[in-house]
């Protein structure tokens, strides 16, 4: 389960995803129905601080104003002084990061509302999902796997496996090897357009030469929702993953383990 956290929940979170409350309800119902066959639950959690490259506190304009949420910051904007790092020591790192993003044709740097700040209510798992997670743990006598991501201040980390760009080239091999061990993998969470999609792509690219693994993966499409404006693009990308890697796209009601 990807980032089933309060800050992504509809009407209450700082980066709320429309449809997320119903997604969680369907996900917990699916987990309950399949309790006897669901071996393990792995959850990723966004875990941030205020001073990170995708938060407003990192940046100021020439007048000292911080950017508004959803501002896009480009390499040229920083190169020519439209935006600069609040801490001048970070400017060179920020320029390098933006250049790497743009040269790789990846996502643009978006300033997100402050979300999933470490230790806050918004960073916690949503309550009904948490209840089901630990009910599963008690019934199956297995500890849930919690994977924290997004703590590096100098980069974005949408996917569960690795950052968008990272000088250290960190890859979460523990997660990948856990995935390799299972007969079937079901992915749900928020948002389908960003962290779910990025996680799926990273996993599939790692196992791209082993269709016996990629074909085990199912996206529970009614247990995830996109950020507004990305609906059509997300559907097209999911269809492309299905075509290329043989994953399955199913409603939770269609999957009985």
Task: Describe the function of each predicted region.
Residues 2-42, 48-257:
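Active-site-adjacent betaalpha module
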